[in-house]
Amino acid sequence: MNRLIAKTGSIIVIVTVFLFAVFLMTDLVFWSYLVCLILPIGYIMMTVGFHHERKGENSSASLLGVLFAAVYAVLIMLVYYAQLTAVNLGGLNEQAAVLLDFRRGGLIFSYDLLGYGMMSLSTFFVGLTVRGKSKKDKILKYMLIIHGFFFFPCLIMPMTGIFASGMSDGETSGSGVMALVCWCVYFIPIGILSFLHFNKNDD
């Protein structure tokens, strides 16, 4: 059951990140928000699978991975549920829209980046615990650890005000879309390699 949950989580990660890239490129904003709401569920399921494998060895690092995943999930689900409800349904005044509309680059956008910063920390600590002699497991380990360094730009860039000035009109920039698509291209293999990792053995 433990590996089934982890494999299911990996599949959710693969599918949601792929669909996120597709919806970004086709400008289907509502659907891109919807899959972002689902992604944290799969990611937590996948992360708990890595933690279960440790069974005492390196369990502190894997537990940190799970805890940061939980913080990520809370932040991201609040961000995108707000987009799908309060923002999508309309009726917000200008001040509320600046704060809550993701595309305006305000507070809610900063929370989104903070959430993905927490995800980055999660992947870093999970990556430290991945064991396996196969080439695929080694690639997975280093991809998770490298992804952890995204924590720093996710944390620092919103403090510079670069997004608030560049997104004040509420329009999504082409460079922003491409950056997110590049992230998707990087993260989909993590989901695939995680599935293959969990699929090697059964409980």
Features from the language model and the residues they span:
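Hydrophobic, aromatic-enriched alpha-helical segments typical of multi-pass transmembrane helices
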Residues: 1-203
